[in-house]
């Protein structure tokens, strides 16, 4: 084995298998691009993004860890979100939750 070497099993890996998901349409109403990382609590993203914010409480983007989605000014796109796992306690971000979901 080489340090850092990955030895994956054969076949495809399904991210977030069996976790609840939600599909939302998001529009960037601002004049600057907004980029959202894979583990950011979607409910608390930039206010220039318009969508059903309350429905996204407790969800994040359903994308691979370390990646992001960018919303250009005036752009509207549909994204899939996945429920946060673990203890479902959220601190930081925009400070809108600061505790248990």
Curated annotation (Swiss-Prot):
Keywords: Cytoplasm, Hydrolase. It catalyses: urea + 2 H2O + H(+) = hydrogencarbonate + 2 NH4(+). GO terms for cellular component: urease complex. Pfam families: Urease_beta. It is found in: Cytoplasm. InterPro entries: Urease_beta-like, Urease_betasu_sf, Urease_subunit. Its main location: cytoplasm. Heterotrimer of UreA (gamma), UreB (beta) and UreC (alpha) subunits. Three heterotrimers associate to form the active enzyme. Belongs to the urease beta subunit family. HAMAP family: Urease_beta. This is Urease subunit beta. It comes from Ralstonia nicotianae (strain ATCC BAA-1114 / GMI1000) (Ralstonia solanacearum). The lineage of its organism: Bacteria, Pseudomonadati, Pseudomonadota, Betaproteobacteria, Burkholderiales.
